Amino acid sequence: PGMQAFIRKFVNLQQNEFLDGSQILLLGELNCADLQQQSQNADVATLRSLCAEIDLRLEPVLLAIFEAGLTPIVIGGGHNNSLPLLSALAKNQQQAVNCINLDPHADFRLLEGRHSGNGFSYAHHAGYLQHYFVLGLHELKNSAATLAQLQQAGAEYCSYQRIFVRQELSYQQALEQCIDVVVQGDGDIGIEVDTDSISLMPVSAFTNCGISVQSAEQFVYQLARLPRSRYLHLAEAAPAQHPSGLSAGLNEAGQVLCALVFAFIQGKQHQAQAI
């Protein structure tokens, strides 16, 4: 649904001095209809097995995209797809990569079978993910076990409460802090956005206590300017979750996804020479 919402809006944007459509390739979507069918009334073990099957289907597609020298913009779909993105990029680079995730949840939960809450912990355990930073983590939406695992992995975060409630630092200072972490070493960088982080966005975990669309655009733009950032992943859009129904959700999700994609494209157009 996120992809359909995006396409409806994106194809109606203008080509002008700010956007060159000839540099954009639309590749389509991964067909998971058979897995979706099998998931009906399935138990937890089966659902986790089906999620792992998505990993196996998606990784070779992404690896081919990276090996072609292209920069994928992946519109989900769940945040489980972070694992095949990171594994494909790491295999393309033949080394562990770094990642910054704008997300109220760290998605660093236990290795208990695959689901959308443990893509990054699986990637770290497999040696695909080195430096990991979570921006906007919500202090009460992550278990003690998750926070302990983050610390053990050497991952870092700057919480939503620290920035917006206690105001210990500005949002721009937090962005600079996360950039300092993910530019360490020489590994490529993945840009992850869980759209659950955005207030009133129709998503799988709807919130009115999140960041603005503008703050998310600012995040994407500044990370896209890094020469080593290699992909953008926009996860968890769910138009049907809009309080006013699917039609309103498609409209709103499409607008937000387009804004974030354009921020990424502009960031790449204005890419810094070397960081």
Kindly give the residue locations of the regions a language model identified.
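Catalytic cores of soluble, metal-dependent hydrolases
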Residues: 1-73, 81-82, 91-95, 149, ...
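Short, glycine/polar-rich helix-capping loops at beta-to-alpha or helix-loop-helix junctions
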Residues: 141-151
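Active-site histidine-anchored catalytic micro-motif
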Residues: 56, 62, 66-136, 140-142, ...
